[in-house]
Amino acid sequence: MPDQALQQMLDRSCWVCFATDEDDRTAEWVRPCRCRGSTKWVHQACLQRWVDEKQRGNSTARVACPQCNAEYLIVFPKLGPVVYVLDLADRLISKACPFAAAGIMVGSIYWTAVTYGAVTVMQVVGHKEGLDVMERADPLFLLIGLPTIPVMLILGKMIRWEDYVLRLWRKYSNKLQILNSIFPGIGCPVPRIPAEANPLADHVSATRILCGALVFPTIATIVGKLMFSSVNSNLQRTILGGIAFVAIKGAFKVYFKQQQYLRQAHRKILNYPEQEEA
């Protein structure tokens, strides 16, 4: 048995570089796993390089044998007290950084929403009136109420009320003579019902909803000043401007979608033109 073991050691070959004892007699060998045969032995230096490639800079990552899946037993020299404390601090910081980054991101979004809410209040109510209202309000109410303004605007923008109006239009347009007189042919039956695109599948919808919701107070203020300049109250003028803008924009959108619907319904596929024989 000792002779057989000695013969196996003399015949050992590194499964990384395929070198034998005859190629390098000074190389250090290691048997790190349960493998037998040609994959039993490996150079210490070759295995170290292979482990470095697998760990990719993370010295704490576990590495296993690719053949038998046995985990390599990797040990390090003992650290001194100073190095141990520094290593522990480095690990704690690495684990805490993702949570800190998430907290910073959430905090940035929150204070951006607070700032937007304050600007919106001053824009809708008036600069001086808005500042006076916020100065007299409870700070806790401001910290909770101001960031809800952009949230409510976005949620309100997500309500697709034009689609409900469009369904009612298509359902009762043939019964309302006033619609037929204003829009001739609107209540005529269509040859087929076209397939409509799913609004959730539109990749532009999210950005349009966000931009439209955040710009809405400014548009409502401008429309209110243009159409209801006789109203003295800034708040009432802005509310009326917002209602007018939503109504006018919704009417155009409903009409545009209905015309697209009719265009798709009357779509026709032509015969392929036959080529004249030579």
Swiss-Prot record:
Subcellular locations according to the entry: Mitochondrion outer membrane; Endoplasmic reticulum membrane; Peroxisome membrane
Keywords for this protein: Endoplasmic reticulum, Membrane, Metal-binding, Mitochondrion, Mitochondrion outer membrane, Peroxisome, Transferase, Transmembrane, Transmembrane helix, Ubl conjugation, Ubl conjugation pathway, Zinc, Zinc-finger
Cited InterPro entries: Znf_RING-CH, Znf_RING/FYVE/PHD
Catalytic activity: S-ubiquitinyl-[E2 ubiquitin-conjugating enzyme]-L-cysteine + [acceptor protein]-L-lysine = [E2 ubiquitin-conjugating enzyme]-L-cysteine + N(6)-ubiquitinyl-[acceptor protein]-L-lysine
One annotated Gene Ontology cellular component of this protein: endoplasmic reticulum
Keyword Cell inner membrane attributed: no
GO molecular function terms noted in the UniProt entry: GTPase binding; ubiquitin protein ligase activity; zinc ion binding
Coiled-coil regions listed in the entry: none
Documented effect of changing C68S: Loss of E3 ubiquitin ligase activity. Formation of highly interconnected mitochondria and perinuclear accumulation
The protein's Enzyme Commission number: 2.3.2.27
Effect of C65S: Loss of E3 ubiquitin ligase activity. Formation of highly interconnected mitochondria and perinuclear accumulation
Binding site for Zn(2+) 1: C14, C17, H43, C46
Topology in membrane: Multi-pass membrane protein
GO biological process: negative regulation of cytoplasmic pattern recognition receptor signaling pathway; positive regulation of cGAS/STING signaling pathway; positive regulation of mitochondrial fission; positive regulation of NLRP3 inflammasome complex assembly; protein autoubiquitination; protein K27-linked ubiquitination; protein K48-linked ubiquitination; protein K63-linked ubiquitination
Transmembrane domains' residue ranges: 99-119, 139-159, 209-229, 238-258
Pathway linked to the protein: Protein modification; protein ubiquitination
Post-translational modification: Autoubiquitinated leading to degradation (short half-life).
Mapped zinc finger ranges (RING-CH-type): 6-75
Domain notes: The RING-CH-type zinc finger domain is required for E3 ligase activity.
Subunit structure: Monomer and homodimer. Interacts with MFN1, MFN2, DNM1L and FIS1.
Function: Mitochondrial E3 ubiquitin-protein ligase that plays a crucial role in the control of mitochondrial morphology by acting as a positive regulator of mitochondrial fission and as an important regulator of immune response. Plays a crucial role in maintaining mitochondrial homeostasis by regulating the dynamics of mitochondria through the ubiquitination of key proteins involved in fission and fusion such as FIS1, DNM1L and MFN1. Acts as a critical determinant of mitotic apoptosis through both MCL1-dependent and -independent pathways.
Protein name: E3 ubiquitin-protein ligase MARCHF5
Gene, per the UniProt record: MARCHF5
